[in-house]
UniProtKB/Swiss-Prot annotation:
Family label: Belongs to the tetrahydrofolate dehydrogenase/cyclohydrolase family.
Gene3D superfamilies xrefs: Leucine Dehydrogenase, chain A, domain 1 (3.40.50.10860), NAD(P)-binding Rossmann-like Domain (3.40.50.720)
HAMAP family: THF_DHG_CYH
Catalytic reactions of this protein: (6R)-5,10-methylene-5,6,7,8-tetrahydrofolate + NAD(+) = (6R)-5,10-methenyltetrahydrofolate + NADH; (6R)-5,10-methenyltetrahydrofolate + H2O = (6R)-10-formyltetrahydrofolate + H(+); (6R)-5,10-methylene-5,6,7,8-tetrahydrofolate + NADP(+) = (6R)-5,10-methenyltetrahydrofolate + NADPH
Membrane topology: Peripheral membrane protein
Protein name: Bifunctional methylenetetrahydrofolate dehydrogenase/cyclohydrolase 2, mitochondrial
Pathway, per record: One-carbon metabolism; tetrahydrofolate interconversion
PROSITE patterns (alphabetical): THF_DHG_CYH_2 (PS00767)
Job description of the protein: Bifunctional mitochondrial folate-interconverting enzyme that has both NAD/NADP-dependent methylenetetrahydrofolate dehydrogenase and methenyltetrahydrofolate cyclohydrolase activities.
């Protein structure tokens, strides 16, 4: 007796379910060429505005949690050395935490701090019942192994989502504390109403803290314990030949760029109507003013004329990453990430 191929029978059932569309931004989506024949520019997704809405939701969650008689969520941040960018990032995180009602403390150590001392600090914070979440600001000095330090944080307090257990659970489609930047990208896609079901996605970037988790979230079965995007995902990186990368991106419905290369993605690499999420953070010298400015991995001005959705840099994924870090802190306080 013939047996129907299981994969195809499941596919038919899943196709009947279809994609879930989020309300809001999608209703104003780019429609290619209008009746006038004029091309519409992309919807520019403001991560700043989206993050403000999420922070309001987190603030309400914190207040409700405290009203039930629970301890206020507490975030401990460890900062090593005097990297100006790291200090700026940490100040922003502390300010945002305060705004939503999360307590925070900053532990600053010199750049010559030993790995053993950092592990002692994380051990103390792990055992402290007042501490809901722990974050070690990266990068760390060369003599300190970042993976060892990240794994020294208790998984249930690892609000960055970098612990090997959290990464492992993410890859197995199980509930976990998800890396904040990957979570930010996923939240942007969902809230903007960008369809992922059955779509082709290119993730340019293979880091285990950003690119890989993004790919995991997008390709996961939407009916698993930790639902994903049901997309077909291709992962590229800084050493993917440009023509090969272009061949992939020209077929992509969604392009997510986290390679750390200014203007890696140009307009000729993007198909009409693709959604483009720029995770890049690059400081370059402005050829006109001579001043340093922040840019992403996408040629924003050119690509926005072809894309359906696009995130700017700054003001896109960055603010959302901070918001998702705060969300992880609240989840850790409630101990409901698993």
């Amino acid at each position: 007796m013939a047996t129907r191929a299981r994969g195809f029978s499941l596919l038919r059932g899943r196709l009947g379910r279809g994609p879930v569309r989020a309300p809001g931004v999608a209703e104003r989506a780019w429609r290619g060429f209008g009746s006038s024949g004029r091309r519409h520019e992309a919807v520019i997704i403001s991560g700043t505005n989206m993050a403000k809405q999420i922070q309001k939701e987190i603030q309400q969650g914190v207040e409700s949690w405290i009203a039930l008689g629970n301890r206020r969520p507490h975030l401990s941040i460890i900062l090593v050395g005097d990297n100006p960018a790291s200090h700026t990032y940490v100040r922003n995180k502390i300010k945002a935490a305060s705004a939503v009602g999360i307590c925070s403390e900053l532990i600053i150590k010199p750049k010559n701090v030993s790995q053993e001392e950092l592990l002692d600090i994380t051990d103390q914070l792990n055992m402290d019942p007042r501490v809901s979440g722990i974050l070690v600001q990266l990068p760390l000095p060369d003599h300190v192994d970042e993976r060892t330090i990240c794994n020294g944080i208790a998984p249930e307090k690892d609000v960055d989502g970098f612990h090997i257990i959290n990464i492992g659970r993410l890859c197995l489609d199980q509930h976990s504390l998800i890396p904040a930047t990957a979570s930010a990208v996923w939240e942007i896609i969902k809230r903007a109403g960008i369809e992922t079901f059955g779509k082709n996605v290119v993730v340019a970037g293979r880091s285990k803290n950003v690119g890989m988790p993004i790919a995991m979230l997008l390709h996961t079965d939407g009916e698993h314990e930790r639902p994903g995007g049901d997309a077909t995902v291709t992962i590229a990186h800084r050493y993917t030949p440009r023509e090969q990368l272009k061949a992939h991106t020209q077929l992509a419905d969604i392009i997510i760029v986290a390679a750390g290369i200014p203007r890696l993605i140009t307009a000729d690499m993007v198909r009409e109507g693709a959604a483009v999420i720029d995770v890049g953070i690059n400081y370059i010298q402005d050829p006109v003013t001579g001043k340093t400015k922040l840019v992403g991995d996408v040629d924003f001005e050119a690509v926005k004329k072809k894309a359906s959705f696009i995130t700017p840099v700054p003001g896109g994924v960055g603010p959302m990453t901070v918001a998702m870090l705060l969300k992880n802190t609240l989840l850790a306080a409630k101990n409901i990430a698993y």
